[in-house]
């Protein structure tokens, strides 16, 4: 089983929002590493900074949360393999052509699902209802 996650799940896990209890509960019951991409890594760290800039989280917390995230990467709870961006973009283009006109999917959401498929993920973690539909249509199991 390969589990991949999008930024909404990771922000809830490492940041602090209304879904944080759900992310922590899922994480406590899971022993498998979660696979992410450099795109997800970038988007999460930027989202943490954005949240601090907008005062959604306290001053200095974006750095603290990013350290927690990077610690989990270093300790293997998260895995960030090298991925071929060309492969991800090709799969994202395919998913967009197949689903965006009927599902109104955003670009980065499509990239995360495409990357999960390229990494041969079986499961996908997201708190974004629209992205959940895309992931399920792409054959991924979305357990939360």
Could you tell me what each predicted segment is?
Residues 77-129:
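Active-site neighborhoods of divalent-metal-dependent phosphate/nucleic-acid chemistry enzymes
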Residues 5-6, 105-107, 128, 140-144:
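Histidine- and aromatic-rich ligand-binding microenvironments
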Residues 131-138:
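Short loop/helix-cap segments at secondary-structure boundaries that form the rim of catalytic
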Residues 47-50, 70-74:
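Acidic/polar active-site rim loop that often engages polyanionic ligands
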Residues 17, 72, 95-99:
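A short secondary-structure junction motif
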